[in-house]
């Protein structure tokens, strides 16, 4: 009787949040009865709540050894294993719990979540359907189903599941938060309301802060975005995504100490290689080559060889004009990680910059066998073919045939392109709120919109996206369907936009030569251009094709296109392209988009 009262006391303390007191009571019970399974299990739960997950797991396992037929013991072990990201073992624990207690709803929900963690979305959905077959009004099961569907790319069905869960249980912070996170990912304006509701209901952790940051960014509320991302970093200073996003937002807002939170986390975690590497990469992108190089040399000295560190150091050294040193580090990195896309890409870039096209060629061919539609490797295939004088270059880079220029007519509702572009320019001006260019892209001395234009409801933006459809179809009709040409073989069936954004070049603004890795067909549409672009000799602000990023003297541009308001240029995403700088105070404003074929 005394032991039973003490177990009840330990349980009450645990439910009151007094985990340490519960541990003490359980310890006293176990000193008298070392094989008391319930006390051992409570000890495991209490230790878990103190944050000692390892000891908690040991005690939960011990309690199961003592009484293996208790389904709730297995379910609680599954909860802790999932917290510890031991997903396979967590799934096994939940499955055992359900063998013993088939109607244990919490265990089935835990199993569905864990299967989702494992990427086993069909199995996760099946568990949700079992729950819903027993109770179609199970709001928790609907919220989990929404998560499963969202992870599987079924955004519409996921949204419907979340909204049904909220209708059944308006107090579900999980459903409100996950709906908001989905809408933020889709860059929809309703995300903010859902996330604010979740916060009022008590969602105040890392994911809530980060997703509020995303939603604020989409709403062009840059101050709120920074505040929320800073909160996310405060909650998880070692989170790479949050640190990277916060630093990039601060950089684009013109903050000279944009990486201060990351630098602080690196100082506190000097052995966290990925954090240190992220800081070096961001410093490099911001032009602070010396600081980035020093950090990586120190990291290699302290932690030893690391292909990711060496590859990034090689890229920095190339930018610093030291290609021989760069090649040494790049070769070592590629030898250690021969299948690493970015590692091999850095090596190939350095080899081509040094004029070693024959040395680069085997790496490119191997990567193309693995990823034949990779825009990066097609770009480098074309570069090597050009250097070596191979016919393949002209097949891939027929600039007259594959770079097409369309001068558009005014969309319905506007009397002229001048009137339309003036309205469009005013709309875009309101969306260009940053002070600096993105930290990790090819724009220099300019700004880029933060929200995709694809989800922007403004009528002028909807009108210009609609106006692009006819020239896109005309472009596609002119393409052959040769199986050995990457653009032609993709020209089958439907295609879709994968991104659309606006760029504003300011004084001395330009684009570094680049390709678009996430597209198949890319573009530039000119909204406003400065008067200096009319000079055909200087070619200020003109679009240029054929010059790689690290060009040899002979690899000069092979085609230029003059920007004009109302002009759309379409071209393969793998083509190297950039712009000449503009030099005056008038801005050059354009819209760009990428497209890919719809698969399956």
Where are these regions (language model features)?
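Short coil turns that delineate tetratricopeptide repeat
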Residues: 34, 68, 102, 136, ...
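Catalytic core of non-heme Fe(II) oxygenases with the double-stranded beta-helix
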Residues: 455-469, 473-570, 575-600
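Non-heme Fe(II)/2-oxoglutarate
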Residues: 395-490, 510
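Register position in tetratricopeptide repeats
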Residues: 15, 49, 83, 117, ...
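Helix-start (N-cap) detector for alpha-helical repeat units in TPR-like alpha-solenoids
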Residues: 3, 37-38, 71-72, 105-106, ...
